[in-house]
Regions:
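Long, Lys/Arg- and hydrophobic-enriched amphipathic alpha-helices
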Residues: 1-158
């Protein structure tokens, strides 16, 4: 069982058209998901659909219909292939933690308040958002300097 994202490829193709119609450009997507090898792992034989209602998670979208948020993980390999098919370059793919650290989060937090440092820690902690969320960068050419992928690039896993 898996989720199907019929509009995903069309969205990427439309994005590529718009980026190429201008002076070029780049797009970065941050979401929770996996490269294809992990996305279709046997442990996820029932897909990745999750439902959230009143701060509780469960996997049955047919319970309490209309009263909760329903979400699914992104197949980042599918995103990368759609981008390449549309003429875009994949600048990089990594976890949110590496992306933010590569952009200088640690240096920015050195003089931040305790509350701000605590919030930043949640963004990069591997047991919270740091590893769960992934980032993929797409651009009209590989000439874009995508600093967020300097260390920890996982493009080879796509």
């Amino acid at each position: 069982l898996t989720e199907i994202h019929p509009q995903g490829e069309a969205f990427i193709a439309s994005l590529a058209e718009r980026l190429k119609a201008g002076r070029g450009g780049a797009a970065f997507f941050l979401d929770y998901g996996f490269p294809e090898g992990e996305y279709f792992h046997p442990q996820r034989h029932m897909g990745t659909v999750m439902c959230h209602q009143l701060h509780k998670a469960h996997a049955d979208p047919l319970v309490a219909v209309g009263q909760k948020d329903i979400t699914a993980h992104v197949n980042f390999t599918g995103v990368a292939l759609a981008a390449q098919n549309a003429g875009l370059e994949v600048l990089g793919y990594t976890c949110q933690a590496w992306f933010l650290l590569n952009l200088g989060l640690a240096e920015r937090m050195a003089e931040a308040s305790l509350a701000e440092r605590s919030q930043a820690q949640r963004l990069v902690n591997e047991h919270e958002m740091g590893e769960l969320f992934k980032v993929i960068g797409l651009a009209t050419s590989a000439d874009w300097a995508a600093q967020g992928f300097d260390r920890g690039d996982r493009s080879h896993r796509l």
